[in-house]
């Protein structure tokens, strides 16, 4: 009898998703050659000295040092002229474009682009309808400037390592006294370092989602591109002499050289940031929860407060881009908010850097959206918390640039916090728009895909896509070829919902405000916090049953 009463009093279980979705080393025999061999570098210099006699070796060396060094060309680009024949529906050499650049021959579509297009599933009709969008996504995919830097401070489940970097170091008045500046490095040293980096460059790593919902295309990508021609009042390149301006880490050889810091300089900078002392005396009960390319993640307890924290331990000798760690720490340290997974502390322990962050035991929102069904009240609660985080970041001139369910962490109490600042970009009034292709393709805003200058509202578009994730369990176009997905993002406007009639009018209006193609008409974080949809938000504690149900479903599926 009592058992029957207990069963009646238990709330129904949350609804689950049914388908959780080498060079030639042989030496030349010069003696057999009828022609004289090419003079070596030293012989060239000796001959030049005989032609232009100086005082002595020391004088010549001094003069050589005084001569201005002419660097290799940088930031150059190969302009490809491609036209489109509306009759045949084929991409052709653009004769007019070639005439605009004297000396250039018409090239037509490059072979690698043609191969990409053949496997893209973009139909001939779609190519004919919007050839420029096709070219935009082809340029993005064929870029050789893509980099795969670690997001060092990533603390999400499984210690995911994704493709990303801090695009700008903090430059607010709070941090102006300690900008992570990098002194110039000599050309010879830098070339050697660059060769070593190229040889040791790890292969690209796919950013993870839960195994049962993972797509090979769901990864974060970064492409450094030339800024489009825009009025100076809108975009002004940051001045190298202005210590308070944001210096962008553009992915070019010359700028990588300028941003070099020696290991000793990095250690000196880190010593000025980290806390003094032994973290093993402050934290106890270390438990390993993840291992990644950039380090190992543990949970631990703060002895003084009893707070559970996440600690990432990184061997600095194994980090290829150590200066980016400094930038990421500084960005996180200066942007603390209740809706952000906050940086707590850091320590140098031997050759390791230990970074202490808040720990949220509920896991990522991805687990909830792929394993359970959320109602509008729960979705509104998550959107409100994310908008509060974005309003804070945007008001501090920070764009997150990688908003998606993977980067939203949940506490067991239902708290919602934004994490993963490996892509975040700081902007100043002079640098009010950015034009770097960055983020995860399926969550990208159209202005990013089409390589236009953009601002904080790219995060709002991504939030709208994440809201669709919460409804449907995945973002739009996830099962499309990535090239076609980018084409659809660039051309379709607001993505269509599978069953829009199931959503309330106020929710559909919220989605339309987030997913407005016209950036000027798209809502800002501050504006959307006043949207009527958020009044439907349930208490955050309503998320707890979903978190528990998702954990159970994942545990059962792994058996």
UniProtKB/Swiss-Prot annotation:
Main location, first listed in the record: cytoplasm
Active site: residue positions: 402
Disordered: annotated segments: 1-72, 164-212, 228-262
Cellular component GO terms held in the UniProt record: cytoplasm; cytosol; glutamatergic synapse; plasma membrane; postsynaptic density
EC numbers for this chain: 2.7.11.1
One GO molecular-function entry: metal ion binding
Post-translational modification: Autophosphorylated when activated by CDC42/p21.
Domain Protein kinase: 283-534
Disorder cited: Intellectual developmental disorder, X-linked 30: A disorder characterized by significantly below average general intellectual functioning associated with impairments in adaptive behavior and manifested during the developmental period. Intellectual deficiency is the only primary symptom of non-syndromic X-linked forms, while syndromic intellectual disability presents with associated physical, neurological and/or psychiatric manifestations.
The protein's role, per its UniProt record: Serine/threonine protein kinase that plays a role in a variety of different signaling pathways including cytoskeleton regulation, cell migration, or cell cycle regulation. Plays a role in dendrite spine morphogenesis as well as synapse formation and plasticity. Acts as a downstream effector of the small GTPases CDC42 and RAC1. Activation by the binding of active CDC42 and RAC1 results in a conformational change and a subsequent autophosphorylation on several serine and/or threonine residues.
Protein's UniProt name: Serine/threonine-protein kinase PAK 3
